[in-house]
Curated annotation (Swiss-Prot):
Protein residues bound to ATP: 39-46
UniProt cross-references to PANTHER family, sorted A to Z: DNA-BINDING TRANSCRIPTIONAL ACTIVATOR DEVR_DOSR
Source organism superkingdom: Bacteria
Organism: Cronobacter sakazakii (strain ATCC BAA-894) (Enterobacter sakazakii)
InterPro entries: P-loop_NTPase, Sig_transdc_resp-reg_C-effctor, TPR-like_helical_dom_sf, TPR_MalT, Tscrpt_reg_HTH_MalT, Tscrpt_reg_LuxR_C, WH-like_DNA-bd_sf
Descriptive protein name: HTH-type transcriptional regulator MalT
Activity regulation as described: Activated by ATP and maltotriose, which are both required for DNA binding.
Amino acid sequence: MLIPSKLSRPVRLEHTVVRERLLAKLSGASNYRLALITSPAGYGKTTLISQWAAGKTELGWYSLDEGDNQPERFASYLIAAIQQATGGHCASSEVMAQKRQYASLSSLFAQLFIELAAWPRPLFLVIDDYHLITNPVIHEAMRFFLRHQPDHLTLVVLSRNLPQLGIANLRVREQLLEIGSQQLAFTHQEARQFFDCRLSQPIEPAQSNRLCDDVAGWATALQLIALSARQNTGAVHQSARRLAGINASHLSDYLVDEVLNNVDNDTRQFLLKSALLRSMNDALIARVTGEENGQMRLEEIERQGLFLQRMDDSGEWFSYHPLFGSFLRQRCQWELSTELPDIHRAAAESWMAQGFPSEAIHHALAAGDASMLRDILLNHAWGLFNHSELTLLEQSLKALPWESLLANPRLVLLQAWLMQSQHRYSEVNTLLARAEQEMKGEMDDTLHGEFNALRAQVAINDGDPDEAERLAMVALETLPLANFYSRIVATSVHGEVLHCKGDLTKSLSVMQQTELMARRHDVWHYALWSLIQQSEILFAQGFLQAAWETQEKAFTLIQEQHLEQLPLHEFLLRIRAQLLWAWARLDEAEACARTGMTVLANYQPQQQLQCLALLVQCSLARGDLDNARSHLNRLENLLGNGHYHSDWVSNADKVRVIYWQMTGDKAAAAAWLRQTPKPAFANNHFLQSQWRNIARVQILLGDYEPAEMVLEELNENARSLRLMSDINRNLLLLNQLYWNAGRKSDAQRVLMEALTLANRTGFISHFVIEGEAMAQQLRQLLQLNTLPEIEQHRAQRILRDINQHHRHKFAHFDENFVNKLLNHPEVPELIRTSPLTQREWQVLGLIYSGYSNDQIAGELDVAATTIKTHIRNLYQKLGVAHRQDAVQHAQQLLKMMGYGV
């Protein structure tokens, strides 16, 4: 829950000097990306901008305090300020901020700018007291903000020092409007206006000018002079002399003498106690100070000119001027040290009564009251956890003694979930085991169930499905239906275990159940996770269209619940890319993989390994080995600098092995095979993948017998588990094995079976990557004219893709082929009497394969003009005039030689 006063622009006070000269300068603020107002405390920055903001409706105001160094809190308030300015225009960004569904502040701002692009009018965002920000993460995010904000948005920053926002670049590009302390200092005329408003008896202009000069136009000093004059008519010159040359850091003594010592004791106590509140209203004041009518007291303090300012139009919220508030808090530490814990406790109770647990925790920590902190956490910790207030929770739990956690085991559970969210899996089990061992009395079944549900999640994350299954089932047996979150966790783990064990039908059913439970209780990340799992299961079963439709549901969920920046979004994009790749929609597959990498841009580079493997895979399917090698270099560097789950390693190894096959790199393949552990089983599609990698290398090395044993066993397991997509892949590897071993009839048999199964899976690229050997076999099958119609269309599509993408297509026109062609009894007489050179045959092969002139020049490493000469010569020899005629001529020659094209 956001504190309204932090989003309220300060109310324009009576008796303030209107700074016409500065307002005139600010009138052109919409022409700049940044308006920067900097000066030491007390120069009137906030007052000036509140005057300028008066009457502007499309303006958001965000007043900072020290707690805003938490990036999540900063994001929530900043987006709320934008929403205030736009009347709720940026709904997606607001939901993402509220639910902490973004990878970083920069990525959240990127989403914000997408929404603001449709905003039609100038817009302003004021951030006050930016000097309180010390977190470099926020500084970096705001630099991103300034680089990418839309042109119609102006950021207005108020700070006591020069902020780390990269302003030099903005200054050079004339996108920065600056107002500093010299400009903020009062002029003689403004000082006279100020005294005329504040003093009952006017002072002479010369005297006013001298006072202004004595304090160098410092507004706070002028206010203190006026305050002293009201309290003691003879104090004007004395105050001016004391304040001359003084700065904000040496004001304490002056404020004690001239302010605190000149008010009655009740007012002094009120000031000191109320200053502990970063913002205050009637109820807070009444509870903290004991005043019966807090609102009336605040208005009285305001009338006395004691540096109190209204924070909203309703006049409900107040705060002290930062300079004065800081001074009062310091004095409170000295003068009321024994009462401080009680004051903070009262503040915490009042904040709790108004529904602000985060502020209450701040005061409970300051009071050192572990019991109060414990009670707040017991009532509100899970709400804070679900809103990702993780830093605050961690700080709070550390402040509680271990005995207090033991006495309230749900706080132990909370601490364990915090560790789980930070991937500190081993610490989770250690913490829970220690708690169970040291806890006094029996744990009830519900708590046991919650502990076991969390342990089950840790076990599956840590690659221990057997232990995960045991714990999940025990949890489900003991957890009541009301403990929906832990039941969702345990059910999800159960479904994932079934998936790992190859029981896809049951796993699909359990994951559908998980989705329903998660949707019912708005646990959206588990709903998304269950949809991703369902899609993977359907893919493994060979139902790729159903997998596609499930992915569509997941993308809709992401859009509706604004989950775009969760890492799970990358997972969904990745499995969509895998499906698109299988269907030979390579450009779309690559786009999904790159979007996935963008989602993970703010995480460790190792997280991008799987998407990077997909980029390699797309390049391999296109036959672009140079690009594949470039991506592989980065992939292998990541592999060597991280620890990965076996599934990730298997996917990375797959593209490496295919690359070695395409390039004939037997040495690299053999080295990999020597050091790669062989999985103990092949009872799911993850393990099947790594065994296929091993078999592919064995085939490349000519070790056909062990490769055949592997593939036969894989198929046996896959058939028993109905892993139809794996059967399709295994058949293609068997085809390669039989073809290379000279077992042509076996090769044809399994190829036809693979083509038939592809009617269900839709596979294209899995055939294409096998290259020329696959092309030769498909030509022969098409020439036999025995394929059913659907398989025939698929074979033609695969052959077309091989011809389009793979760079060894012109091998049809190598020297041996040309010799056989010239000796063929049906060779056209024109070719026999006017034969093409070997280079011209190569060019014809590349024209037939769909290469442009520039691509042919690149392939043969000659100039484009040379290629044009070759083409002109071969056209003349073939008696053709156009490129398409040459393609048809080449096709006829290939058909004559027995190639079905």
